[in-house]
Amino acid sequence: MATQELTSLYDRLGGVYSIAAVVDDFIDRVMKNPILNANPAVDEAHHRVSAAGFKYYVTEMVCWATGGPQHYSGRGMRESHDHLKITEGEWAAFCEDFDDTMAKFNVPEAERKELFAIVESTKGDIVTA
């Protein structure tokens, strides 16, 4: 078995501090993305929810989803996103921001694919319009 298969994605990403740095950049991109903010419900949420709180929950979730010791304590994806009526175009903009962030931090291709698979697994609960 390859070493990569024996090491969690969480560890291969560098643990909580590395994940938090990537999430910090990613959420900054998402919060100011004009495509996402053209949706009035998303824009309102971006002004109502603090970026720091959003970053905390996303970091917690990414750590948990990648095999880290953290436990996600936020609401479920459908519950937190259903009222936003996110479209396919907004999802694509979100994914582009995610890809740009991973490129900025030189996340290796194998780990990028694994992270995208995790993100993609949430699409059905997030894209509701």
Go through each PLM region and give its residues.
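Core of compact, soluble alpha-helical bundle domains
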Residues: M1-A129
